[in-house]
Amino acid sequence: MLNNKSILITGGTGSLGKELTKTILKKWPNVQRLVIYSRDEQKQYQMAQEFPESEYPAIRYFIGDVRDLERLKRAFNGIDYVIHAAAMKHVHIAEYNPDECVKTNIGGAENVIKACLSSNVTKVVALSTDKACAPINLYGATKLTSDKLFIAANNIKGKQDIKFSVVRYGNVMG
């Protein structure tokens, strides 16, 4: 499924991004390229110690923020599949910094969609949360909005060969 494909994970140094990286490298050892896209230089450095390019020649580390559309477009060059895992996910931090949460979780989603539509990406999976079902806080509301944007992108793609999907998870342990 992913062998000989180029995959990019936004939020690739986060808890879900790291686990996805482990899974992809284990199950699909012939992945053409796996791009870890995140804004945290220190986490990228640490992840590169765990997954060095010398042992994992397909892996690439790309500094960038989902709020920066032009940087996303550059990162998506030559990518087949995008897994969107970047988000502000801590409920109390989102409540204290609502503008940043909206910019990242909604604006970032819009930018990922725009960058995918302007490139040759064929599959997009946005990671969401159970908090998006009947949201009671800002985090849940922004993720519900993000989910709706990704699903609606299937209606604006025209004849472009791209599929947008959303998956929701519960609380992740471990």
At which residue positions do the language-model features occur?
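N-terminal Rossmann NAD(P)H-binding glycine-rich loop of SDR-like oxidoreductase domains
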Residues: 5-28
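Conserved glycine-rich Rossmann-like NAD(P)H-binding loop of the short-chain dehydrogenase/reductase
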Residues: 29-43
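Conserved residues in the N-terminal Rossmann fold of short-chain dehydrogenase/reductase
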Residues: 38, 62-63, 103
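Residues in the short beta-alpha loop(s) of Rossmann-like NAD(P)-binding domains
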Residues: 40, 50, 130
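Adenine-nucleotide cofactor-binding loop residues
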Residues: 42, 67, 89
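Short, conserved SAM-binding/catalytic segment
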Residues: 47-56
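Conserved Rossmann-fold cofactor-binding substructure of NAD(P)-dependent oxidoreductases
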Residues: 60-81
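Conserved Rossmann-fold NAD(P)-dependent oxidoreductase catalytic core, especially the SDR/UDP-sugar
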Residues: 81-84, 88-148, 152-154, 162-165
